[in-house]
């Protein structure tokens, strides 16, 4: 069974955690930006399904 030979230093551990948290921060910022764009109506890259109205068939 594979076992690490030496203990990982706190500095190396903190580097990995910082990188992981930075990636999470970027993803959260992008998600917030996309949400704001959708709510403000300035989003161009989204396709919204248009509800079909029954009133058009009666004319």
UniProtKB/Swiss-Prot annotation:
Pfam families: Ribosomal_L32p. The keyword Ribonucleoprotein applies. GO terms for biological process: translation. InterPro entries: Ribosomal_bL32 (IPR002677), Ribosomal_bL32_plant/cyanobact (IPR044958), Ribosomal_zn-bd (IPR011332). The keyword Zinc does not apply. GO terms for molecular function: structural constituent of ribosome. One of its GO terms (cellular component) is large ribosomal subunit. Keywords: Ribonucleoprotein, Ribosomal protein. Belongs to the bacterial ribosomal protein bL32 family. This is Large ribosomal subunit protein bL32. The lineage of its organism: Bacteria, Bacillati, Cyanobacteriota, Cyanophyceae, Synechococcales. The gene is rpmF.
